[in-house]
Amino acid sequence: MAPFGRNLLKTRHKNRSPTKDMDPEEKEIVVWVCQDEKIVCGLTKRTTSIDVIQALLEEHEATFGEKRFLLGKASDYCIVEKWRGSERALPPLTRILKLWKAWGDEQPNMQFVLVKTDAFLPVPLWRTAETKLVQNNEKPWELSPANYMKTLPPDKQKRIVRKTFRKLAKIRQDTSSHDRDNMECLVHLIISQDHTIHQQVQRMKELDMEIEKCEAKIHLDRVGNDGANYVHEAYLMPRLSDEEQKLDIQAEINQTLEDLNDSEGMAQLEEQLQYYRALIDKLSAEIEREVKGAGIDGIEDMEGAAACELENSDLESVKCDLETSMKAGLTIHSHLSGIQREIKYSDSLLQMKAREYELLAKEFSSLHISNKDGCQGKENRGKEAEAPSSNGETPPLTQRVFNIYTNDTDSDTGISSNHSQDSETTLGDVLLLAT
Protein backbone atom coordinates (compact mmCIF):
# COMPACT_ATOMS: atom_id res chain seq x y z
CA MET A 1 0.00 0.00 0.00
CA ALA A 2 1.29 3.44 -0.81
CA PRO A 3 2.70 5.34 2.23
CA PHE A 4 0.92 8.51 1.24
CA GLY A 5 -1.91 9.47 -1.05
CA ARG A 6 -4.62 7.44 0.70
CA ASN A 7 -5.39 10.19 3.19
CA LEU A 8 -5.75 12.67 0.32
CA LEU A 9 -8.50 10.66 -1.41
CA LYS A 10 -11.96 12.19 -1.31
CA THR A 11 -15.27 10.85 -2.58
CA ARG A 12 -18.48 12.58 -3.58
CA HIS A 13 -21.65 11.82 -5.54
CA LYS A 14 -21.35 12.37 -9.25
CA ASN A 15 -23.50 15.02 -10.94
CA ARG A 16 -26.34 13.34 -12.85
CA SER A 17 -25.97 15.65 -15.86
CA PRO A 18 -25.23 13.45 -18.89
CA THR A 19 -23.20 16.17 -20.60
CA LYS A 20 -20.48 16.33 -17.94
CA ASP A 21 -17.66 13.84 -18.40
CA MET A 22 -14.54 13.18 -16.37
CA ASP A 23 -11.52 15.30 -17.09
CA PRO A 24 -8.41 13.10 -17.12
CA GLU A 25 -6.27 16.02 -15.90
CA GLU A 26 -8.27 16.28 -12.66
CA LYS A 27 -6.92 12.82 -11.61
CA GLU A 28 -10.25 11.42 -10.56
CA ILE A 29 -12.28 8.35 -11.44
CA VAL A 30 -15.91 7.26 -11.14
CA VAL A 31 -16.73 4.12 -9.14
CA TRP A 32 -20.18 2.49 -8.96
CA VAL A 33 -21.16 1.66 -5.39
CA CYS A 34 -24.57 -0.02 -5.00
CA GLN A 35 -26.04 1.63 -8.14
CA ASP A 36 -24.63 5.02 -7.16
CA GLU A 37 -21.85 6.78 -9.03
CA LYS A 38 -19.17 8.21 -6.75
CA ILE A 39 -16.19 10.27 -7.82
CA VAL A 40 -12.86 9.50 -6.17
CA CYS A 41 -10.50 12.45 -6.55
CA GLY A 42 -6.94 13.13 -5.40
CA LEU A 43 -5.45 10.14 -7.20
CA THR A 44 -1.71 9.86 -7.69
CA LYS A 45 0.46 7.49 -9.65
CA ARG A 46 1.01 5.44 -6.47
CA THR A 47 -2.68 5.11 -5.55
CA THR A 48 -3.72 1.47 -5.62
CA SER A 49 -7.05 -0.30 -5.84
CA ILE A 50 -7.09 -1.09 -2.10
CA ASP A 51 -6.61 2.64 -1.31
CA VAL A 52 -9.69 3.51 -3.36
CA ILE A 53 -11.71 0.76 -1.62
CA GLN A 54 -10.64 2.04 1.81
CA ALA A 55 -11.64 5.61 0.91
CA LEU A 56 -15.06 4.45 -0.33
CA LEU A 57 -15.71 2.40 2.82
CA GLU A 58 -14.73 5.33 5.06
CA GLU A 59 -17.01 7.69 3.16
CA HIS A 60 -19.85 5.15 3.36
CA GLU A 61 -19.36 4.70 7.11
CA ALA A 62 -19.26 8.48 7.64
CA THR A 63 -22.44 8.96 5.63
CA PHE A 64 -24.65 6.16 6.99
CA GLY A 65 -23.11 5.47 10.39
CA GLU A 66 -24.77 2.52 12.06
CA LYS A 67 -27.13 2.05 9.12
CA ARG A 68 -24.32 1.21 6.77
CA PHE A 69 -24.59 -1.96 4.74
CA LEU A 70 -21.01 -2.22 3.45
CA LEU A 71 -19.57 -4.28 6.26
CA GLY A 72 -16.18 -5.85 6.61
CA LYS A 73 -12.65 -4.80 5.84
CA ALA A 74 -11.21 -3.32 2.68
CA SER A 75 -9.62 -6.67 1.87
CA ASP A 76 -13.11 -8.21 1.65
CA TYR A 77 -13.94 -6.01 -1.37
CA CYS A 78 -12.52 -5.55 -4.82
CA ILE A 79 -12.98 -3.22 -7.77
CA VAL A 80 -14.34 -4.85 -10.93
CA GLU A 81 -13.34 -3.44 -14.30
CA LYS A 82 -16.23 -3.66 -16.81
CA TRP A 83 -15.89 -2.98 -20.52
CA ARG A 84 -18.52 -3.84 -23.17
CA GLY A 85 -19.94 -6.83 -21.32
CA SER A 86 -16.59 -8.24 -20.11
CA GLU A 87 -15.53 -8.07 -16.44
CA ARG A 88 -12.23 -8.40 -14.59
CA ALA A 89 -11.44 -8.14 -10.89
CA LEU A 90 -8.49 -5.84 -10.18
CA PRO A 91 -5.77 -7.01 -7.77
CA PRO A 92 -5.41 -4.94 -4.59
CA LEU A 93 -2.07 -3.40 -5.62
CA THR A 94 -3.21 -2.27 -9.10
CA ARG A 95 -2.15 1.28 -9.98
CA ILE A 96 -5.61 2.63 -10.62
CA LEU A 97 -4.63 5.92 -12.29
CA LYS A 98 -2.20 4.23 -14.67
CA LEU A 99 -4.87 1.71 -15.62
CA TRP A 100 -7.40 4.47 -16.20
CA LYS A 101 -5.06 6.38 -18.51
CA ALA A 102 -4.18 3.20 -20.40
CA TRP A 103 -7.76 2.89 -21.66
CA GLY A 104 -7.44 6.09 -23.71
CA ASP A 105 -10.39 6.58 -26.09
CA GLU A 106 -12.32 3.66 -24.56
CA GLN A 107 -12.71 5.41 -21.18
CA PRO A 108 -16.41 6.27 -21.82
CA ASN A 109 -17.15 2.55 -22.32
CA MET A 110 -15.25 1.41 -19.19
CA GLN A 111 -16.60 1.39 -15.61
CA PHE A 112 -15.28 0.58 -12.15
CA VAL A 113 -17.69 -1.23 -9.79
CA LEU A 114 -17.16 -1.98 -6.09
CA VAL A 115 -18.29 -5.51 -5.22
CA LYS A 116 -17.70 -8.06 -2.50
CA THR A 117 -14.83 -10.37 -3.31
CA ASP A 118 -16.73 -13.54 -2.50
CA ALA A 119 -19.73 -12.37 -4.53
CA PHE A 120 -17.67 -11.85 -7.65
CA LEU A 121 -15.10 -14.63 -7.45
CA PRO A 122 -14.86 -17.20 -4.64
CA VAL A 123 -11.12 -17.65 -5.15
CA PRO A 124 -9.48 -14.46 -6.55
CA LEU A 125 -6.97 -15.01 -9.29
CA TRP A 126 -4.26 -12.91 -7.63
CA ARG A 127 -4.06 -15.16 -4.55
CA THR A 128 -1.30 -17.68 -4.62
CA ALA A 129 -1.92 -21.30 -3.90
CA GLU A 130 -1.69 -21.96 -0.18
CA THR A 131 0.29 -24.84 1.17
CA LYS A 132 -1.88 -27.81 1.88
CA LEU A 133 -1.47 -29.37 5.29
CA VAL A 134 -1.21 -33.11 5.07
CA GLN A 135 -2.06 -34.87 8.29
CA ASN A 136 0.48 -37.37 9.39
CA ASN A 137 -1.30 -40.55 10.28
CA GLU A 138 1.74 -41.95 11.99
CA LYS A 139 1.63 -41.13 15.72
CA PRO A 140 4.91 -40.43 17.45
CA TRP A 141 3.53 -41.99 20.60
CA GLU A 142 1.89 -45.21 21.42
CA LEU A 143 -0.36 -43.92 24.21
CA SER A 144 -3.94 -42.69 23.82
CA PRO A 145 -4.64 -38.90 23.82
CA ALA A 146 -6.06 -39.00 27.37
CA ASN A 147 -3.08 -40.85 28.73
CA TYR A 148 -0.79 -38.54 26.82
CA MET A 149 -2.46 -35.48 28.40
CA LYS A 150 -1.88 -36.98 31.84
CA THR A 151 1.79 -37.35 31.15
CA LEU A 152 2.15 -33.62 30.38
CA PRO A 153 2.96 -31.02 33.05
CA PRO A 154 -0.03 -29.17 34.62
CA ASP A 155 0.84 -25.77 33.16
CA LYS A 156 1.01 -27.22 29.69
CA GLN A 157 -2.28 -29.00 30.23
CA LYS A 158 -3.87 -25.66 31.21
CA ARG A 159 -2.48 -24.00 28.10
CA ILE A 160 -3.86 -26.77 25.90
CA VAL A 161 -7.31 -26.48 27.54
CA ARG A 162 -7.39 -22.67 27.14
CA LYS A 163 -6.29 -22.99 23.55
CA THR A 164 -9.01 -25.53 22.91
CA PHE A 165 -11.72 -23.26 24.35
CA ARG A 166 -10.44 -20.34 22.31
CA LYS A 167 -10.64 -22.44 19.18
CA LEU A 168 -14.20 -23.47 20.01
CA ALA A 169 -15.22 -19.84 20.56
CA LYS A 170 -13.58 -18.83 17.33
CA ILE A 171 -15.35 -21.63 15.48
CA ARG A 172 -18.71 -20.45 16.86
CA GLN A 173 -17.94 -16.85 15.92
CA ASP A 174 -16.77 -17.87 12.47
CA THR A 175 -19.98 -19.85 11.96
CA SER A 176 -22.21 -16.85 12.78
CA SER A 177 -20.05 -14.45 10.78
CA HIS A 178 -19.97 -16.91 7.90
CA ASP A 179 -23.77 -16.98 7.76
CA ARG A 180 -23.80 -13.20 7.83
CA ASP A 181 -21.13 -13.02 5.15
CA ASN A 182 -23.05 -15.45 3.00
CA MET A 183 -26.13 -13.24 3.21
CA GLU A 184 -24.06 -10.16 2.38
CA CYS A 185 -22.46 -11.96 -0.54
CA LEU A 186 -25.88 -12.93 -1.84
CA VAL A 187 -27.14 -9.35 -1.53
CA HIS A 188 -24.07 -7.96 -3.30
CA LEU A 189 -24.38 -10.59 -6.01
CA ILE A 190 -28.01 -9.64 -6.63
CA ILE A 191 -27.11 -5.95 -6.71
CA SER A 192 -24.26 -6.58 -9.13
CA GLN A 193 -26.44 -8.68 -11.43
CA ASP A 194 -29.17 -6.04 -11.35
CA HIS A 195 -26.61 -3.40 -12.25
CA THR A 196 -25.35 -5.54 -15.15
CA ILE A 197 -28.91 -6.12 -16.39
CA HIS A 198 -29.62 -2.39 -16.32
CA GLN A 199 -26.46 -1.75 -18.29
CA GLN A 200 -27.39 -4.36 -20.89
CA VAL A 201 -30.92 -2.93 -21.24
CA GLN A 202 -29.49 0.56 -21.66
CA ARG A 203 -27.07 -0.72 -24.27
CA MET A 204 -29.92 -2.43 -26.15
CA LYS A 205 -31.91 0.81 -26.13
CA GLU A 206 -28.91 2.69 -27.51
CA LEU A 207 -28.47 0.11 -30.27
CA ASP A 208 -32.18 0.33 -31.14
CA MET A 209 -31.90 4.10 -31.39
CA GLU A 210 -28.83 3.80 -33.63
CA ILE A 211 -30.64 1.30 -35.86
CA GLU A 212 -33.67 3.59 -36.13
CA LYS A 213 -31.41 6.52 -37.03
CA CYS A 214 -29.69 4.48 -39.73
CA GLU A 215 -33.04 3.32 -41.15
CA ALA A 216 -34.37 6.89 -41.14
CA LYS A 217 -31.23 8.13 -42.88
CA ILE A 218 -31.44 5.42 -45.53
CA HIS A 219 -35.15 6.20 -46.05
CA LEU A 220 -34.44 9.91 -46.50
CA ASP A 221 -31.64 9.15 -48.96
CA ARG A 222 -33.93 6.87 -50.98
CA VAL A 223 -36.69 9.49 -50.92
CA GLY A 224 -34.22 12.12 -52.12
CA ASN A 225 -32.89 9.90 -54.91
CA ASP A 226 -35.93 7.89 -56.03
CA GLY A 227 -38.89 9.89 -54.73
CA ALA A 228 -41.46 9.36 -51.97
CA ASN A 229 -43.10 6.36 -53.69
CA TYR A 230 -39.89 4.44 -54.36
CA VAL A 231 -41.21 1.27 -52.69
CA HIS A 232 -44.42 1.31 -54.76
CA GLU A 233 -42.50 1.99 -57.95
CA ALA A 234 -39.93 -0.71 -57.17
CA TYR A 235 -42.69 -3.34 -56.98
CA LEU A 236 -44.73 -2.05 -59.95
CA MET A 237 -42.00 -1.30 -62.48
CA PRO A 238 -41.49 -4.95 -63.49
CA ARG A 239 -45.22 -5.35 -64.12
CA LEU A 240 -45.36 -2.17 -66.19
CA SER A 241 -42.38 -3.33 -68.23
CA ASP A 242 -44.09 -6.69 -68.87
CA GLU A 243 -47.24 -4.93 -70.04
CA GLU A 244 -45.22 -2.64 -72.31
CA GLN A 245 -43.39 -5.65 -73.73
CA LYS A 246 -46.70 -7.38 -74.45
CA LEU A 247 -48.04 -4.23 -76.12
CA ASP A 248 -44.89 -3.97 -78.24
CA ILE A 249 -45.21 -7.60 -79.33
CA GLN A 250 -48.89 -7.08 -80.18
CA ALA A 251 -48.01 -3.95 -82.16
CA GLU A 252 -45.35 -5.88 -84.07
CA ILE A 253 -47.86 -8.63 -84.84
CA ASN A 254 -50.43 -6.08 -86.03
CA GLN A 255 -47.81 -4.37 -88.17
CA THR A 256 -46.82 -7.71 -89.63
CA LEU A 257 -50.46 -8.51 -90.45
CA GLU A 258 -50.86 -5.11 -92.09
CA ASP A 259 -47.74 -5.76 -94.13
CA LEU A 260 -49.13 -9.13 -95.16
CA ASN A 261 -52.22 -7.44 -96.56
CA ASP A 262 -50.01 -5.67 -99.07
CA SER A 263 -48.98 -7.30 -102.29
CA GLU A 264 -45.33 -7.55 -101.29
CA GLY A 265 -45.96 -8.72 -97.68
CA MET A 266 -45.37 -12.38 -98.39
CA ALA A 267 -42.09 -11.78 -100.15
CA GLN A 268 -40.83 -9.47 -97.42
CA LEU A 269 -41.82 -11.98 -94.76
CA GLU A 270 -39.94 -14.77 -96.50
CA GLU A 271 -36.89 -12.54 -96.85
CA GLN A 272 -37.04 -11.64 -93.16
CA LEU A 273 -37.33 -15.30 -92.18
CA GLN A 274 -34.33 -16.21 -94.31
CA TYR A 275 -32.36 -13.29 -92.88
CA TYR A 276 -33.19 -14.27 -89.29
CA ARG A 277 -32.31 -17.89 -89.92
CA ALA A 278 -28.96 -16.95 -91.43
CA LEU A 279 -28.30 -14.53 -88.58
CA ILE A 280 -29.18 -17.21 -86.00
CA ASP A 281 -26.82 -19.72 -87.60
CA LYS A 282 -24.04 -17.17 -87.81
CA LEU A 283 -24.45 -16.01 -84.23
CA SER A 284 -24.66 -19.61 -82.97
CA ALA A 285 -21.34 -20.42 -84.62
CA GLU A 286 -19.78 -17.25 -83.22
CA ILE A 287 -21.14 -18.04 -79.76
CA GLU A 288 -19.64 -21.52 -79.83
CA ARG A 289 -16.26 -20.17 -80.94
CA GLU A 290 -16.34 -17.39 -78.34
CA VAL A 291 -17.32 -19.79 -75.55
CA LYS A 292 -14.51 -22.19 -76.42
CA GLY A 293 -11.99 -19.38 -76.72
CA ALA A 294 -13.20 -17.79 -73.48
CA GLY A 295 -12.90 -21.13 -71.65
CA ILE A 296 -9.28 -21.58 -72.81
CA ASP A 297 -8.26 -17.97 -72.14
CA GLY A 298 -9.99 -17.89 -68.73
CA ILE A 299 -7.65 -20.55 -67.37
CA GLU A 300 -4.52 -18.55 -68.24
CA ASP A 301 -4.89 -15.32 -66.22
CA MET A 302 -7.39 -13.22 -64.27
CA GLU A 303 -7.61 -10.47 -66.86
CA GLY A 304 -8.66 -12.96 -69.48
CA ALA A 305 -11.26 -14.28 -67.05
CA ALA A 306 -12.66 -10.79 -66.59
CA ALA A 307 -12.80 -10.30 -70.37
CA CYS A 308 -14.50 -13.67 -70.75
CA GLU A 309 -17.08 -12.66 -68.17
CA LEU A 310 -17.81 -9.51 -70.14
CA GLU A 311 -18.05 -11.52 -73.35
CA ASN A 312 -20.29 -14.07 -71.67
CA SER A 313 -22.57 -11.28 -70.50
CA ASP A 314 -22.64 -9.92 -74.07
CA LEU A 315 -23.33 -13.41 -75.38
CA GLU A 316 -26.15 -13.83 -72.92
CA SER A 317 -27.68 -10.55 -74.07
CA VAL A 318 -27.29 -11.68 -77.70
CA LYS A 319 -28.92 -15.01 -76.81
CA CYS A 320 -31.82 -13.16 -75.23
CA ASP A 321 -32.17 -11.04 -78.39
CA LEU A 322 -32.02 -14.17 -80.52
CA GLU A 323 -34.69 -15.85 -78.44
CA THR A 324 -36.90 -12.78 -78.76
CA SER A 325 -36.31 -12.67 -82.53
CA MET A 326 -36.98 -16.40 -82.80
CA LYS A 327 -40.25 -16.03 -80.93
CA ALA A 328 -41.26 -13.15 -83.20
CA GLY A 329 -40.26 -15.20 -86.28
CA LEU A 330 -42.26 -18.19 -85.06
CA THR A 331 -45.27 -15.95 -84.46
CA ILE A 332 -44.93 -14.47 -87.94
CA HIS A 333 -44.52 -17.95 -89.43
CA SER A 334 -47.70 -19.13 -87.70
CA HIS A 335 -49.59 -16.10 -89.05
CA LEU A 336 -48.11 -16.76 -92.51
CA SER A 337 -49.28 -20.37 -92.47
CA GLY A 338 -52.76 -19.20 -91.40
CA ILE A 339 -52.87 -16.69 -94.23
CA GLN A 340 -51.71 -19.33 -96.70
CA ARG A 341 -54.53 -21.61 -95.57
CA GLU A 342 -56.99 -18.75 -96.04
CA ILE A 343 -55.62 -18.13 -99.55
CA LYS A 344 -56.00 -21.82 -100.45
CA TYR A 345 -59.55 -21.76 -99.13
CA SER A 346 -60.32 -18.65 -101.22
CA ASP A 347 -58.83 -20.33 -104.32
CA SER A 348 -61.00 -23.39 -103.76
CA LEU A 349 -64.07 -21.15 -103.43
CA LEU A 350 -63.17 -19.36 -106.66
CA GLN A 351 -62.78 -22.68 -108.47
CA MET A 352 -66.16 -23.85 -107.21
CA LYS A 353 -67.76 -20.60 -108.36
CA ALA A 354 -66.08 -20.94 -111.77
CA ARG A 355 -67.50 -24.45 -112.17
CA GLU A 356 -70.93 -23.19 -111.15
CA TYR A 357 -70.58 -20.39 -113.67
CA GLU A 358 -69.76 -22.86 -116.43
CA LEU A 359 -72.77 -25.02 -115.52
CA LEU A 360 -75.05 -21.99 -115.55
CA ALA A 361 -73.65 -20.90 -118.91
CA LYS A 362 -74.33 -24.36 -120.37
CA GLU A 363 -77.89 -24.32 -119.01
CA PHE A 364 -78.41 -20.84 -120.41
CA SER A 365 -77.19 -21.86 -123.85
CA SER A 366 -79.43 -24.96 -123.86
CA LEU A 367 -82.45 -22.85 -122.90
CA HIS A 368 -81.65 -20.36 -125.67
CA ILE A 369 -81.51 -23.15 -128.27
CA SER A 370 -84.86 -24.60 -127.14
CA ASN A 371 -86.47 -21.15 -127.37
CA LYS A 372 -85.22 -20.76 -130.94
CA ASP A 373 -86.70 -24.16 -131.94
CA GLY A 374 -90.11 -23.17 -130.53
CA CYS A 375 -90.10 -19.91 -132.46
CA GLN A 376 -89.35 -21.66 -135.77
CA GLY A 377 -92.27 -24.14 -135.24
CA LYS A 378 -94.66 -21.29 -134.65
CA GLU A 379 -93.48 -19.54 -137.83
CA ASN A 380 -94.13 -22.71 -139.87
CA ARG A 381 -97.64 -23.01 -138.50
CA GLY A 382 -98.34 -19.37 -139.38
CA LYS A 383 -97.19 -19.87 -142.92
CA GLU A 384 -99.43 -22.90 -143.37
CA ALA A 385 -102.40 -20.87 -142.10
CA GLU A 386 -101.70 -18.01 -144.50
CA ALA A 387 -101.21 -20.29 -147.56
CA PRO A 388 -104.99 -20.76 -148.50
CA SER A 389 -105.46 -17.01 -148.97
CA SER A 390 -106.76 -15.92 -152.40
CA ASN A 391 -103.95 -13.80 -153.60
CA GLY A 392 -101.17 -15.74 -151.80
CA GLU A 393 -99.66 -12.60 -150.21
CA THR A 394 -99.44 -11.79 -146.57
CA PRO A 395 -101.32 -8.67 -145.58
CA PRO A 396 -99.10 -6.03 -144.12
CA LEU A 397 -101.06 -5.94 -140.87
CA THR A 398 -100.82 -9.72 -140.36
CA GLN A 399 -97.08 -9.68 -141.08
CA ARG A 400 -96.55 -6.84 -138.59
CA VAL A 401 -98.46 -8.73 -135.91
CA PHE A 402 -96.46 -11.90 -136.58
CA ASN A 403 -93.23 -9.95 -136.27
CA ILE A 404 -94.38 -8.62 -132.91
CA TYR A 405 -95.18 -12.18 -131.76
CA THR A 406 -91.79 -13.40 -132.91
CA ASN A 407 -89.98 -10.62 -131.02
CA ASP A 408 -91.98 -11.32 -127.89
CA THR A 409 -91.13 -15.02 -127.86
CA ASP A 410 -87.41 -14.44 -128.59
CA SER A 411 -86.43 -14.08 -124.94
CA ASP A 412 -83.93 -16.21 -123.08
CA THR A 413 -85.63 -15.69 -119.77
CA GLY A 414 -89.30 -16.05 -120.89
CA ILE A 415 -92.25 -13.57 -120.99
CA SER A 416 -94.60 -12.85 -118.15
CA SER A 417 -97.98 -14.56 -118.23
CA ASN A 418 -100.03 -11.35 -118.54
CA HIS A 419 -97.98 -10.07 -121.44
CA SER A 420 -98.27 -13.41 -123.27
CA GLN A 421 -102.07 -13.48 -122.81
CA ASP A 422 -102.43 -9.93 -124.15
CA SER A 423 -100.32 -10.83 -127.18
CA GLU A 424 -102.46 -13.93 -127.93
CA THR A 425 -105.78 -12.02 -127.71
CA THR A 426 -104.41 -9.30 -129.97
CA LEU A 427 -103.29 -11.90 -132.51
CA GLY A 428 -106.72 -13.61 -132.47
CA ASP A 429 -108.55 -10.34 -133.02
CA VAL A 430 -106.27 -9.45 -135.90
CA LEU A 431 -106.83 -12.83 -137.57
CA LEU A 432 -110.61 -12.48 -137.25
CA LEU A 433 -110.53 -9.04 -138.79
CA ALA A 434 -108.39 -10.31 -141.63
CA THR A 435 -110.87 -13.06 -142.49
Swiss-Prot record:
May play a role in regulating vesicuar trafficking in cells. Residues 375-386 have a biased composition (Basic and acidic residues). InterPro entries: N-RASSF, RA_dom, RASSF9_RA, Ubiquitin-like_domsf. It comes from the Eukaryota. CDD domains: RA_RASSF9. It is found in: Endosome. Residues 1-22, 371-397 are annotated as: Disordered. Residues 388-397 have a biased composition (Polar residues). The keyword Coiled coil applies. SMART domains: RA. GO terms for biological process: signal transduction. The keyword Cytoplasm does not apply. Residues 195-291 form a coiled coil. Keywords: Coiled coil, Endosome. Interacts with PAM. This is Ras association domain-containing protein 9. One of its GO terms (cellular component) is endosome. Residues 25-119 form the Ras-associating domain.
